[in-house]
């Protein structure tokens, strides 16, 4: 009786596993609308996606050299000497977020201007060339420690578009440069819960555009921070569709997948 019960349970679980699709579902050729609706209704999130949805309240902190130029997008020609946030207090930021009910803070570690808020080895267009803390400062580290102190999760935004890097637009050379920056962020700052990329793809200082190696980029994240969700250009969290601050009344989480 015990063996039979166990066998029936295994059979039941096997059936259940076949009925649900995690993260992605690919419709077979010739599937009817009804079949597609049925399959889509059995699409479930990964544990990381579910945990992300349950947080509900994340703060995206836009801070960088543009804070000192008053521009939305920098051109990569900024003098690092203007970056000198002598009164920076990441604990004050995170304490306010905690009191406001936020569950995670994401920092613009590098925006389109290419200026890095951490002491990267990849470029001089960073905090190391600024007067702030005599070039020894690290905004990413200060925010990371503040998040740890107040119990918030931590994420990073890294702009694929770089208007300062000379290798931008040179294919493999820039992809290697970008992945090196990403690797620094994912290995030197403890657990990273979200990695946020947009699809910005303007011209670099050489007038060229870059073809990003998203496959290699996402593999790097999965290898170094397997629990992190990837947002917008990743395959865990998609863009809401506008920058107005509000999504549609009904905003489904399903993402269209184009099979190879």
Map each language-model feature to its residues.
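Bacterial Sec-dependent N-terminal signal peptides
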Residues: 1-19
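Mature catalytic domains of secreted/periplasmic carbohydrate-active enzymes
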Residues: 17-260
């Amino acid at each position: 009786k015990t063996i039979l019960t166990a066998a029936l349970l295994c059979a039941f679980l096997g059936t259940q596993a076949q009925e649900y699709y995690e993260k992605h579902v690919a419709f077979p050729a010739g599937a009817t609308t009804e079949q597609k609706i049925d399959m889509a209704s059995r699409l479930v999130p990964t544990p990381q996606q579910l945990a992300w949805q349950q947080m509900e309240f994340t703060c995206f902190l836009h801070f960088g050299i543009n804070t000192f130029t008053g521009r939305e997008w920098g051109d990569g020609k900024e003098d690092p000497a203007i970056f000198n946030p002598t009164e920076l207090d990441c604990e004050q930021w995170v304490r306010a977020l905690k009191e406001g009910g936020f569950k995670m803070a994401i920092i613009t570690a590098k925006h389109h201007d290419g200026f890095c808020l951490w002491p990267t080895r990849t470029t001089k267009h960073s905090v190391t060339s600024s007067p702030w803390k005599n070039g020894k400062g690290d905004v990413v580290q200060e925010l990371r420690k503040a998040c740890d102190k107040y119990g918030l999760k931590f994420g990073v935004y890294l702009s694929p578009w770089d208007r300062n890097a000379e290798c931008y637009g040179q294919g493999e050379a820039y992809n290697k440069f970008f992945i090196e920056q990403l690797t620094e962020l994912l290995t030197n700052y403890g657990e990273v819960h979200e990695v946020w990329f947009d699809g910005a793809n303007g011209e670099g200082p050489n007038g060229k555009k870059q073809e990003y190696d998203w496959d290699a980029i996402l593999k790097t994240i999965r290898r170094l921070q397997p629990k992190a969700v990837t947002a917008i250009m990743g395959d865990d969290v998609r863009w809401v569709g506008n920058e107005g601050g509000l999504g549609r009344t009904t905003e489904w989480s399903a993402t269209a997948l184009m099979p190879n």
